[in-house]
Amino acid sequence: MFNVLGARLQQKKRTIAFPKEEPVLPDRFRGRPEIQQSLCTPDCRICAEACPTDAMRRDAEGLTLDMGRCLFCGECAAVCPLKAIRHTTDYRLAVRNRNDMILKGSEVALASALQRETLRLFGRSLKLREVSAAGCNACEADVNVLGTVVFDLGRFGIQFVASPRHADGILITGPISRNMMLALKKTYEAVPTPKLVIAVGACAISGGPFIDNPEIHNGAESTLPIDLYVPGCPPHPLTILDGLLRLIRAR
């Protein structure tokens, strides 16, 4: 016991000061994409053809990038001869509306807080039930790590619970396979109202690399109303945490 206490005193505090202090991320971190329309030529489609999920498209206003489909693979930036696309180190990606994930430049309408009455209920205590709907465990792992001493999700009043009956909402990962659809619906119905639905990762938002597969429902939006979208493949733990805190007005 004394050895344990001694080790604790020696290690001191290991929890990051986020959100009071901004995290320091490596230069290689692939965060929010940025499109420089001025560098892009109107007839070029090299990046769109290279994108594995059809996240890059061109309309009358220029290039658009759908972060809900984006795998953050960096292929578009790698093949662009004019370097009109790049990934910044900005980890803040969570939004409230699906259309806010369509980028035309560098600005993102970050997630706003819940409405006043809902915020009164969940602002200081938010219990979530996680549903892995045919996920690969990457998003699940980055959600799980929020419970470690580094991030300490519980200090914000947010916790994951074992039963949907004890939850205020569900957090979904995975592309929603046909075999998981019934389980997802039953979990949603078991959560008392009012309730929240959070889609984490490209798979849960759009189907990710499995888009239009006959066994996949292309994300949760076709089935449930989504209150928070957290794009990424997988999203960084800080991206998920930032979105959750914005939802309960802790940022």
What is the meaning of each model-derived region?
Residues 1-50, 54-59, 78, 88-95, ...:
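Non-ligating segments of multi-cofactor redox enzymes
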Residues 61-71, 77, 81, 86-251:
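Iron-sulfur-associated redox domains of electron-transfer enzymes in respiratory
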